[in-house]
Amino acid sequence: MHCPICHHRAHVVYCAHCINTSPSLLLKLKLDLILLKDENKELNGKVEQILNEAMNYDQLDIKRMEKKKDPLMNSLMKLDVLRMKKNNNLIRHRIEQLNERIYSKRNHISELKVEIDNYKCYKVGTGTDKLIEQVEISDAKNKLAQVSKICESVRDYKLNLLNNWFVIQKLQDNFQIPFAIAFQPLISLKNFRVLPLAITNDSINIMWKYISFFSDILMIKLPYTNKICEQPMFEFSDSIQTVVQRLIKLIINILQICRHLKLVPSTPMDIPWLLDQYDVDGLFYNMVKRNKMKCRSVSLYWTFGMLYSMVLDNMNNPQRGHPARRTAPPPTVTGPHDRWYVVG
């Protein structure tokens, strides 16, 4: 091949046919190829050795490695050193940032401590007073709870003794007199006209005594008191109107005690409906046993005059009450002081 400018031969070019058919040309090129392969193998071995030594240079003798002075190994070592420096710089920068944050937080903590100390010095008096007051209130509440439990147990014990003393009991198979107190029948609107006046007065007196003791144990003040002086058994001469008035006052006191014991609601009640369901003896017995009673609510409270008229109407109505009581035989004619109604 000739140069187009100077026309000198630069390279010798042979065609493929001549190369394949000429033994001298083929042998020479094959020998050159073999030599190149051997040189490549030798260079590959050196490169691998240099790479291995460069990767494990920290485990080899540095002076011995420096004596070799291989360019590739030196370049790789420099590259590792640069990488290490870069990592060290990043770590150093991160450490500096963390130190700055730590210093800023320390300064903030010290400022907060100063403020807390100032606040404590300012609020130490009021804080101590509040703490002492809370402790005293807690102790007082605990003592009050203990005293309340003791008072309730003592009250229950006294009420049980009072019930045993007055022998309050529920009679079986007796529709006319279902309840008894101190071996006397409990008065109701249904048996008021059946019992003699002396028995009625004695029963009301006993119920008044029980109500008085009951209110003393509960330490409550009743709307009415029994101001009528007690007379001997055979010298009682109260009229029916006076007995009815005492009975109404007794009903009001019973309802007041039931409200205090939360047996009935404190709101206005439908007293006629309540008496129709329980009657006076049922109210008294449920109060003694502290049983809750069903009630109907109304908008106005009942007065003494309204109750007086209602009680008189109920006692004068012969069609009122339980069928067994309405069909009961008429009372036996007795004297004013006959005690045949005493129950046992």
Swiss-Prot record:
Pfam families assigned: ATG14 (PF10186)
Coiled coil: 26-156
Region (Cysteine repeats): 3-18
BP terms from Gene Ontology: macroautophagy; protein transport
Primary location class: membrane
Compartmental location: Preautophagosomal structure membrane; Vacuole membrane
GO cellular component, one term: vacuolar membrane
The keyword Translocase is annotated on this UniProt entry: no
Keywords: Autophagy, Coiled coil, Membrane, Protein transport, Transport, Vacuole
Function (record text): Required for cytoplasm to vacuole transport (Cvt) and autophagy as a part of the autophagy-specific VPS34 PI3-kinase complex I. This complex is essential to recruit the ATG8-phosphatidylinositol conjugate and the ATG12-ATG5 conjugate to the pre-autophagosomal structure. ATG14 mediates the specific binding of the VPS34 PI3-kinase complex I to the preautophagosomal structure (PAS).
Subunit description: Component of the autophagy-specific VPS34 PI3-kinase complex I composed of VPS15, VPS30, VPS34 and ATG14.
UniProt name for this protein: Autophagy-related protein 14
Organism: Saccharomyces cerevisiae (strain YJM789) (Baker's yeast)
